Each structure stands twice: as structure tokens, then as C-alpha cells.
């Protein structure tokens, strides 16, 4: 009996019976048992960063990451050594506001070793963005260290879309401080946040 004939015959069955019939046919096509089908691991990726502040370039990578992975965790690093403009609560808030209508995205902060955080979240991939060749050397070094610490966790490098390839949080803050127009480069909530931060600051 051909697959088409089997499908037409089984389509007339009750909804519950039809579901299991189609499941059985799917599993046969994949060469696995029904138990194995439901035990296929959903992949979770962690996208870490300081995000001071989040830009549309960051959001672009998040969207593309969701095309590849079932779940994305945006991990905002506390990282006090970088002396961020926005505190950790503000940075997390900005991202949550920007992605609030998205599915399968979590946003939270972390202050421990990245590889330990990834294991805590039961993720198996780290996403890192590369704007330029100059970023690659540092990120490669970090990915090799992470692999040394845990060989089961992979790092995926992603290039930003061309329209965002020039963006960096540092440049955006400088432009905002000098009263430049950053609309279209950061989420609206960040535009408002930067205006508040620099409202009473004078250019020296």
C-alpha cells in the first residue's frame, strides 16, 4: 500500500486515532520509534552580552537565533569592570520591552562564569555576534576556553545584517550624548532611556 493510500484511509479515522496514525507514519519516515520521537532534545541557546544598551543589531541576531534554536536565553552580564552606563535592571528591562511579543525568549541577568550559567540553564550552544574581523580573535579565544571547560557546549558565531554591521553600544552612546538621532538604531525604549541619562549632561 502506497503512503498516499495509507494516508487517505487513515484520515477518515477519529481525530485521536488519526493523530497516532500520522505519528506512526512520521516515525517510520524518520527511522525512529515513537518514544525516540518525543525524546528528541529541543535546543536552547544562550546569547550573552553586556547590552549597554541593547541595539537593533542585537535584536537582529536574536531573531535569527530563534530561526535556528527552539529557545533563546538572552543573558545580560553584570560585569562591573566595564562601568556600564545603565545598571543591570535597566538593561534587562530594555531587552524585555523590546522582545515582549516574541515567543521562546527569556531575558535575565547573570554574574557567574558564562559556561557555568549555560550549564545551569541546560543549554548547549552559546551565540556570539561578530561585527568585524577584529572581534574574531577575542571571541575565538573565549570560545576555545569555553570548549576546554566543557566540550559539550558549542559556540556559534553570527554576523549581523549589513544594515547593522556598523552599530556598537559604545558608538550609540557617544552619538546620543552629542544629541545625535539614534532612532532606527535602537528600540524606542532605549531612545527614551538615553535621552533621560544625558538630559542634563553638558558637552565639555
Located regions from the model:
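Nucleotidyltransferase catalytic core that binds NTPs
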Residues: 32-204
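A cross-taxon signal for low-complexity, glycine/charged-rich
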Residues: 1-11, 15-18, 23-36
Amino acid at each position: 500500500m502506497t503512503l498516499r493510500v495509507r494516508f487517505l484511509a487513515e484520515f477518515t479515522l477519529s481525530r485521536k486515532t488519526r493523530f497516532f496514525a500520522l505519528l506512526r507514519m512520521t516515525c517510520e519516515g524518520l527511522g525512529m520509534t515513537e518514544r525516540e520521537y518525543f525524546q528528541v532534545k529541543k535546543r536552547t541557546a544562550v546569547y550573552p552580552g553586556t547590552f549597554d544598551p541593547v541595539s537593533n543589531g542585537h535584536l537582529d541576531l536574536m531573531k535569527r537565533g530563534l530561526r535556528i534554536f527552539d529557545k533563546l536565553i538572552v543573558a545580560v552580564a553584570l560585569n562591573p569592570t566595564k562601568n556600564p552606563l545603565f545598571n543591570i535592571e535597566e538593561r534587562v528591562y530594555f531587552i524585555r520591552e523590546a522582545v515582549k511579543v516574541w515567543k521562546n525568549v527569556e531575558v535575565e541577568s547573570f554574574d557567574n562564569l558564562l559556561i557555568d550559567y549555560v550549564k545551569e540553564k541546560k543549554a548547549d550552544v552559546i551565540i556570539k555576534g561578530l561585527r568585524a574581523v577584529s572581534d574574531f580573535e577575542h571571541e575565538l579565544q573565549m570560545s576555545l576556553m569555553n570548549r576546554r571547560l566543557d566540550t559539550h557546549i558549542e559556540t556559534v558565531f553570527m554576523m549581523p545584517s549589513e544594515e547593522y554591521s556598523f552599530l556598537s553600544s559604545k558608538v550609540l552612546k557617544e552619538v546620543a550624548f552629542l544629541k545625535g538621532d539614534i532612532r532606527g538604531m535602537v528600540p524606542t525604549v532605549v531612545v527614551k532611556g538615553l535621552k533621560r541619562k544625558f538630559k542634563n549632561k553638558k558637552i565639555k
